[in-house]
């Protein structure tokens, strides 16, 4: 018999740095999941990714308190900030520009995000990421 799904928990956890403190502890403790087991499994799965990069994760909790999880690619905004070398986006993106990214960097980010954005071509993903860049106050060159 298949396991019955009790809940889906969506979190953003820093790669290789999952620990029982918030937000992981309270979210999983509420569902009765073994928090340390998740932290060890998540850290092992994300050890090849740059430490500290926020990784979205969807945890499926079953009625017998077991779980599975799927990691996604980092948010486009985080990858854009890293590519542009900035700490944060602009508060007034239409007036204050805080940095620039090249089309090549946008394509690289689109190819990284391709695993999560199903059904879209690379060009469509590039347009989406360029829009995110503009809304952050970044100038897209090329």
Curated annotation (Swiss-Prot):
Keyword Ribonucleoprotein belongs to the record: yes
Entry annotated with the keyword Ribonucleoprotein: yes
GO molecular function: large ribosomal subunit rRNA binding; structural constituent of ribosome
InterPro entries the record matches: Ribosomal_uL11 (IPR000911), Ribosomal_uL11_bac-typ (IPR006519), Ribosomal_uL11_C (IPR020783), Ribosomal_uL11_C_sf (IPR036769), Ribosomal_uL11_CS (IPR020785), Ribosomal_uL11_N (IPR020784), Ribosomal_uL11_N_sf (IPR036796)
One GO CC term, this protein: cytosolic large ribosomal subunit
GO biological process: translation
Keyword line: Methylation, Ribonucleoprotein, Ribosomal protein, RNA-binding, rRNA-binding
Post-translational events: One or more lysine residues are methylated.
Subunit structure, as described in the record: Part of the ribosomal stalk of the 50S ribosomal subunit. Interacts with L10 and the large rRNA to form the base of the stalk. L10 forms an elongated spine to which L12 dimers bind in a sequential fashion forming a multimeric L10(L12)X complex.
PANTHER family reported in the protein's UniProt record: 60S RIBOSOMAL PROTEIN L12, LARGE RIBOSOMAL SUBUNIT PROTEIN UL11M
Family, as annotated: Belongs to the universal ribosomal protein uL11 family.
Function: Forms part of the ribosomal stalk which helps the ribosome interact with GTP-bound translation factors.
Name this polypeptide is given: Large ribosomal subunit protein uL11
Organism of this sequence: Yersinia enterocolitica serotype O:8 / biotype 1B (strain NCTC 13174 / 8081)
Gene: rplK
């Amino acid at each position: 018999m298949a396991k019955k799904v009790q809940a889906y928990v969506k979190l953003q956890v820093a790669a290789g740095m999952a620990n029982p403190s918030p937000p992981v502890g309270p979210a999983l403790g509420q569902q009765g999941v073994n928090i340390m087991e998740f932290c060890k499994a998540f850290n092992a799965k994300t050890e090849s990714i740059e430490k500290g990069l926020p990784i979205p994760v969807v945890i499926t909790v079953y009625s017998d308190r077991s779980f599975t999880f799927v990691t996604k690619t980092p948010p486009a905004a985080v990858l854009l900030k890293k590519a542009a070398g900035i700490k944060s986006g602009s508060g007034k993106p239409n007036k204050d520009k805080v940095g620039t990214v090249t089309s090549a960097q946008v394509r690289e980010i689109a190819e990284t995000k391709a695993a999560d954005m199903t059904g879209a071509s690379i060009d469509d993903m590039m347009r989406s990421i360029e829009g995110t860049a503009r809304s952050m106050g970044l100038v897209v060159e090329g």
